[in-house]
């Protein structure tokens, strides 16, 4: 009798191990696993942008229900997710304006002003785009991540994470972040204010190979406070560059073209 029980238990165990549902349950991430959540955000950061030095151009188009589209273009130099230079190239009336980010510190340099102006990352740059959306993309360094759940978007299994700001210098107080499980591609983000008000939703789109791996080359920002306003960021000409640290200094900016 006991031998039969042992054999039955062995058969049941084998069935559990090979059932698809059991495999999914084993692979399902435990909610609240901080180490796993941090790893997911780090990997998604590397999908969005290289960790090494790189250059790219960004075109931002903003549309509203009652006005013509506004188009602005920028040249971006970035290194290590902590140092960024953003140069305005269009419109011509703003050409020569430069943003310099070092860590969480951001300055704007204007051709007509001798001293740089300190700016917050959360301040609006244009349309639904904040300074930090363009100058800083270091979610892993700016937020503490918690894995909330998994769900599907367009049939793709995704992690759903809650990102909480490490301090008040970062662009947003809280972010809900959807990342595809199969390849850590970011899918969507919702950005919230300190008062927990939804500010905007970002959709990561147009995945193409650029600078060594497949990345989202278009971001669509949907303004939650201005329902008729939408901004798209189109990335182009992304390439790796050896950028010396001296580029990311106030004294060097006048030499940039």
Can you name each region flagged by the protein language model?
Residues 1-12:
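Bacterial N-terminal signal peptides that target proteins for export
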Residues 32, 37-112:
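N-terminal mature ectodomain segment of secretory-pathway/periplasmic proteins
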């Amino acid at each position: 009798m006991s031998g039969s029980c042992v054999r039955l238990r062995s058969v049941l165990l084998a069935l559990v191990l090979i059932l698809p549902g059991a495999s999914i349950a084993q692979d399902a991430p435990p909610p609240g696993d901080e180490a796993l959540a941090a790893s997911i955000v780090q990997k998604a950061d590397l999908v969005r942008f290289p960790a090494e030095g790189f250059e790219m151009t960004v075109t931002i188009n903003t549309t509203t229900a009652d006005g013509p589209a506004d188009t602005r273009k920028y040249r971006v130099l970035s290194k290590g997710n902590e140092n960024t230079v953003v140069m305005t190239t269009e419109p011509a009336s703003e050409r020569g304006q430069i943003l310099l980010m070092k860590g969480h510190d951001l300055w704007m340099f204007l051709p007509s002003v001798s001293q740089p102006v300190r700016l917050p990352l959360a301040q609006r740059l244009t349309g639904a785009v904040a300074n930090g959306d363009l100058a800083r993309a270091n979610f892993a360094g700016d937020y503490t991540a918690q894995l909330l759940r998994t769900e599907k978007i367009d049939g793709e299994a995704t992690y759903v994470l809650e990102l909480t700001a490490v301090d008040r210098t970062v662009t947003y107080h809280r972010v809900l972040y959807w990342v595809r499980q199969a390849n850590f591609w970011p899918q969507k983000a919702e950005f919230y204010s300190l008062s927990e008000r939804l500010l905007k939703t970002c959709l990561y789109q147009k995945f193409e190979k650029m600078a060594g791996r497949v990345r989202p080359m278009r971001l669509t920002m949907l303004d939650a406070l201005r329902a008729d306003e939408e901004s798209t960021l189109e990335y182009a000409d992304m390439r790796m560059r050896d950028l010396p640290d001296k580029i990311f200094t106030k004294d060097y900016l006048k030499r940039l073209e």
